[in-house]
């Protein structure tokens, strides 16, 4: 299992990432002037000075949730980077894994066994060892949150997507359902100032769209988080971001979990509630068009579909767009809830 608590060099790592990201902006537009490049590099240096030192690793959240409920437990694994590990919060019940396991247990009325293999600072290339560890526990469903570090580390998008696809295919081949929360909107991070912030937003959305197409092709489902969380995080940064102004706060993670939970339920065969239909948003269309629509309409689920008995049409694979109702998991559970009473199994 990867050690999600290895965060001592987080500030230095984040500083290098921001500097590299500034280099992306400097080289991404050939016509950019040297002065523009200097502005970007200056903004990167300012962001490095603003982001504080790491204080503690994210709390462990492994265990059985709803242990007293009837039936065999559903096994869920959480893979990805610091956003999957829950970096930025201090209580187990505030982590995305705990929020999802609690909500899943309540909706299914069954125990949920949670294993977190996410690693702080992980790139998409780090998913392979996480998947290998996850397969040992025979998961029913995997939730993957990854992509932000690929943007800041200048990972070529085709390379990052290939690693993600390999992870999804391996899990699906083992009979595990897969839900991917696509790349977050890095343009909401306050220590990053315009024009570097604009580049961050553009690259985040490009990677999220590429992830959507590739994951659905590989048999998984996606939920667009960037375009949903971006406006809320930009409007209320004091509430949505943690103390480091880079990672989500407890409330930020709760909103993300509320968006992911309906799709996790659907992947497991449950039928979650749906929000009112938006004309022109829901329905079956080509996968590239579906990815574009999902980016424009927050919280939209994208999954594979058939049309007239065919998986593919002139525009490629068919995809289904759905809008799910956000469940009450968005509220951080109070002390004494199922999240706090989870049976821990050998966790630190």
Protein language model annotation of sequence segments:
Residues 189-224:
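Substrate-gating cap/lid alpha-helix
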Residues 249:
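Short, conserved phosphate/pyrophosphate- and ester-handling motifs at nucleotide-, phospho-/glycolipid
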Residues 124-161:
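Oxyanion-hole/transition-state-stabilizing segment in secreted/luminal serine hydrolases
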């Amino acid at each position: 299992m990867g050690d999600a608590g290895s965060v001592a060099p987080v500030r230095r790592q984040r500083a290098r990432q921001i500097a590299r990201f500034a280099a992306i902006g400097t080289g991404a537009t050939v016509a950019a002037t040297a002065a523009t490049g200097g502005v970007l590099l200056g903004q990167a240096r300012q962001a490095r000075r603003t982001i504080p030192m790491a204080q503690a690793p994210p709390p462990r959240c492994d265990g059985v949730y709803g242990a007293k409920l009837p039936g065999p437990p559903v096994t869920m694994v959480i893979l990805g980077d610091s956003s999957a590990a829950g970096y930025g919060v201090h209580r187990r019940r505030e982590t995305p894994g705990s929020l999802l396991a609690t909500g899943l247990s309540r909706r299914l009325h069954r125990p949920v066994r949670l294993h977190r293999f996410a690693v702080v600072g992980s790139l998409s290339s780090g998913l392979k060892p996480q998947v290998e560890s996850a397969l040992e526990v025979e998961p029913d469903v995997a939730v993957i949150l990854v992509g932000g570090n690929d943007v800041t580390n200048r990972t070529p998008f085709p390379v990052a997507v290939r690693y993600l696809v390999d992870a999804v295919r391996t899990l699906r081949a083992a009979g595990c359902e897969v839900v991917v929360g696509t790349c977050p909107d890095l343009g909401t991070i306050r220590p990053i100032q315009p024009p570097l912030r604009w580049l961050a937003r553009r690259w985040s959305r490009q990677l999220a769209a590429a992830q959507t197409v590739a994951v659905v092709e590989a048999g998984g489902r996606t939920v667009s988080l960037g375009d949903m969380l971006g406006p809320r995080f930009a409007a209320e940064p004091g509430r949505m971001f943690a103390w480091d102004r880079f990672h989500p706060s407890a409330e930020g993670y709760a909103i993300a979990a509320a968006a992911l939970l309906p799709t996790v339920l659907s992947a497991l065969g449950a039928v979650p509630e749906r929000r009112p239909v938006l004309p022109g948003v829901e329905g079956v269309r080509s996968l590239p068009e579906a990815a574009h629509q999902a980016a424009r309409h927050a919280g939209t689920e994208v999954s594979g579909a058939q049309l007239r008995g065919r998986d593919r049409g002139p525009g490629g694979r068919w995809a289904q767009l759905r809008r799910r109702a956000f469940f009450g998991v968005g509220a951080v559970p109070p002390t004494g809830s199922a999240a706090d009473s989870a049976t821990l199994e050998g966790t630190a």
